[in-house]
From Swiss-Prot:
It is found in: Plastid, Chloroplast. Its main location: plastid. The keyword Ubl conjugation does not apply. GO terms for molecular function: glutamate N-acetyltransferase activity; L-glutamate N-acetyltransferase activity. Its EC number is 2.3.1.35, 2.3.1.1. Transmembrane segments: none annotated. Catalyzes two activities which are involved in the cyclic version of arginine biosynthesis: the synthesis of acetylglutamate from glutamate and acetyl-CoA, and of ornithine by transacetylation between acetylornithine and glutamate. The record marks T225, G226 as: Involved in the stabilization of negative charge on the oxyanion by the formation of the oxyanion hole. The lineage of its organism: Eukaryota, Viridiplantae, Streptophyta, Embryophyta, Bryophyta. This is Arginine biosynthesis bifunctional protein ArgJ, chloroplastic. HAMAP family: ArgJ (MF_01106).
């Protein structure tokens, strides 16, 4: 028998590619292993799979395996002289059963990261399940997050004129009511550019959830992601709702299932929760998000849900969420495309108790804003890091601007620069491309004040290039790509108080390949 020594899984929703390298070791079963994410480009490395069907165990050393999609089952073709086909259920080969969870890097602050995602905050339950909405495998594709009481609601949405039906519905619903009870999320069909029929599908799906949750239809919000122009598979979704509602729980596993269910081309799921104190009251905030491609400021192609148990008024919570989004999701970019479906919804249950936060200028509001910023920035960075084909996260920090908005504009410009992103992938410490993107951002500044650092390498001072260790700088970029780490670009444009950050990723050959093969 041949034993799998390593397994490379490119876990794109509609394009799962399986390649197994075999050793000559004799084994009837594979050692138990917790599959971990290690440095990769568009691939996830799984050193040893916990379970593998017997059909694969019979393959001989040296066989290369190629994946062919056959509905919900993956046909794996062994590249032998006989070109044998064997069928493998997706659940049997995916690390972490479906896709791994992304590590979330939080900014430093008076909070502690805890398990739980959207169910960490008091009063929330979640579920995620496979409802036959997507073609590839049995990866969950339908999620539901509910609050046991009326939760103060907030939302931000795409600025794309071709807004999807769920975006239009949520905007109207949030305008009509300051509270909500449930958020339904489907993956597989964007329900964008689907006209009146698509909007009616949204209403019927919302009605089904409201009925089985025992809440008013106006208390249910909805998000959709997937292929533009395709309506929700309404019948399959509605049929799945009773089981979905019945599986709701406050467990970490339920939160994780919901985080996976909302993904599309993501290689990793994004989920985070923190615990902190606000005005002496212990509170929790959690969130999930999806996004990998079509990511550009003014939201990025992303869906997100935030839950918290702070007691806060809508007049404070809603502008607070907008501020946090402007400092996070509106500051990430992968490919310059802004989606039709971008949505972030945020619910506050008030279940933690403590005094109600009703003054946005209060110290308690400042503390809540900082915690919310941390959660959303952590999720945003994980989305940028998971950019299609990306080998590293790029973090751009701008200081010395006239105000935060000016700094944010410059940071976005550099993070979005295709030439800068390509140079980083090529491990080229090209200060000229960074300076160019800084200059065309549309923010006036004195070029003689321009300073640029790449990591610890000082590239420019007073608008002039400096001599630096180009080999060392190139090695810095190479190492970041090898370990899927972070490339830091620090830019100073003057002496003002404004500062901001933006996040992106490098631009690889694989980005073009992935999007040439994937129908948007």
């Amino acid at each position: 028998m041949a034993m799998v020594s390593s397994c490379r899984l490119c876990l794109r929703t509609d394009s799962l590619y399986l390649a197994i390298e075999q050793s000559a070791a004799q084994a009837n079963s594979l050692p138990r292993s917790s599959c971990s994410v290690v440095p990769r480009r568009t691939q996830i490395i799984c050193p040893q799979l916990q379970v593998l069907p017997n059909a694969l165990k019979s393959l001989q050393p040296g066989h290369g395996l190629k994946r062919l999609k056959e509905g919900n089952v993956f046909a794996v073709r062994a590249s032998t002289t006989t070109d044998t086909d064997v069928n493998v259920d997706a659940d049997a080969v995916a690390p972490g059963k479906f896709i791994p969870a992304s590590p979330i890097v939080l900014s430093k602050g008076p909070w502690e990261q805890i398990p739980g995602g959207v169910t960490a905050a008091k009063g929330f339950r979640a579920a995620g399940m496979y409802a036959q909405l997507r073609a590839a495998g049995k990866k969950p594709d339908l999620a539901l997050i509910v609050c046991d009481t009326d939760a103060v609601s907030a939302g931000t949405f795409t600025k794309n004129v071709v807004a999807a039906a769920p975006v239009i519905y949520c905007k109207k619903t949030l305008a009509d009511s300051s509270t909500a009870r449930a958020i339904l999320i489907n993956a597989g069909q964007a329900n964008a550019a689907t006209g009146d029929a698509g909007y009616q599908d949204t209403l019927e799906c919302v009605a089904a959830v409201a009925k089985h949750c025992g809440v008013p239809e106006g208390a249910v919000l909805i998000e959709s992601t997937g292929v533009i122009g395709r309506r929700i598979k309404k019948d399959a979704l509605i049929e799945a709702v009773p089981k979905l509602v019945g599986s709701l729980s406050a467990s970490v596993a339920s939160a994780d299932a919901a985080a996976v269910a909302i993904t599309t081309t993501d290689l990793v799921s994004k989920s985070v929760a923190i615990e902190t104190k606000i005005g002496g009251t212990t509170v929790r905030l959690g969130g999930i998000a999806k996004g990998s491609g079509m990511i550009h400021p003014n939201m990025a192609t992303m869906l997100g849900v935030v839950t918290c148990d702070v007691d806060v008024t809508a007049e404070v919570w809603r502008p607070m969420v907008i501020t946090a989004v402007n400092r996070s999701f509106n500051q990430i970019t992968v490919d310059g495309d802004s989606s039709t479906n971008d949505t972030l919804l945020a619910l506050a249950s008030g279940a933690a108790g403590g005094p109600k936060i009703s003054d946005i200028n209060s110290e308690e509001a400042r503390q809540l804003q900082a915690a919310l910023d941390a959660v959303l920035q952590g999720l945003a960075k994980s989305i940028a890091s998971d950019g299609e084909g990306a080998t590293c996260l790029v973090e751009v920090t701008v200081t010395g601007a006239s105000d935060e908005a000016a700094a944010a504009t410059v940071a976005r410009s550099v993070a979005a620069s295709s030439l800068t992103k390509a140079a980083i992938y090529g491990r080229d410490p090209n200060w000229g491309r960074i300076a160019c993107a800084t200059g065309y951002a549309g923010v006036p500044f004195d070029p003689l004040c321009l300073q640029i650092y790449l990591g610890d390498f000082h590239l420019m001072e007073k608008g002039q290039p400096l001599e630096f260790d180009s080999n060392g700088a190139s090695a810095y970029l190479k190492k970041a790509g090898e370990v899927h780490g972070t490339v830091s670009i620090n830019i100073c444009i003057g002496h003002g108080p404004g500062q901001s950050q933006a996040w992106g990723c490098d631009l690889s050959y694989d980005y073009v390949k992935i999007n040439a093969e994937y129908t948007t």
